[in-house]
Amino acid sequence: MFHEFHACQHADAPTLVLSSGLGGSGRYWADDLTLLTRDYHVLVYDHAGTGRSPAVLPADYSIRHMAIELLALLDSLDIQRCHFMGHALGGLVGLELALLRPELLHSQVLINAWSSPNPHSARCFSVRKKLLLNSGPEAYVQAQALFLYPADWIAANGPRLADDEAHALAHFPDTDNLLRRIHALETFDVSAELSRIHTPTLLIANRDDMLVPWQQSRHLANALPNATLVLLEYGGHASNITDPLPFQRALRAFLSTQP
């Protein structure tokens, strides 16, 4: 899979692996790299079947497949221990990593994640699939901001959104791949296994998230044996982009306590 390794100036710094959401592109984390590389070597990657990682995804593709693909990448780079941060679908990958290879993870940060399907998110993904199949990629991409960002942020960031949408359209994934990735997150359910995950975990959720109810993170915080929840008031589904300072404070406070 396509990946980029952003080195910290401190050679002995720990490694932090970043996993993006449904779009799958490592580009999602661009705004965070300057801060994170002060203290960490940072690995970003494009998920299989997205962006610069071309692949034909199998019909039974799952979040576990995604975790196994990431493990293969980490093995190829001889990364034996790391911190992990995942956004939405990327957070689900983190939960699978913690189940498949718990000794890999120093800690994990899960942003607006969940452990099982919920009716609201299911409705959102149903609408997005219909947009893709009935109106095409352009409508799908233009609607994406409505699910990710607060209304006032959208209104104030037209030029950035136009650039992001042009890039997304230019690198739009194969329709079958995208539908299989959506199906993977729609059917993901590790609720019965959460008590097995002892990895130190920070859950960051946003009260105004239009895509994933923040109560999903509260459930994770209650079910995981070693988890902390930070609930942010503003930022939508992607507050590391829309309101980065509160997000960064929560992230740094947690990571500073991890070895």
From Swiss-Prot:
It is an enzyme of class 3 (hydrolase). The keyword Transport does not apply. GO terms for biological process: glycerolipid catabolic process; nitrogen utilization; uracil catabolic process. Keywords: Hydrolase. Its EC number is 3.5.1.-. One of its GO terms (molecular function) is triacylglycerol lipase activity. The keyword Hydrolase applies. It catalyses: carbamate + 2 H(+) = NH4(+) + CO2. HAMAP family: RutD (MF_00832). Belongs to the AB hydrolase superfamily. Hydrolase RutD family. Involved in pyrimidine catabolism. May facilitate the hydrolysis of carbamate, a reaction that can also occur spontaneously. This is Putative carbamate hydrolase RutD. The gene is rutD.
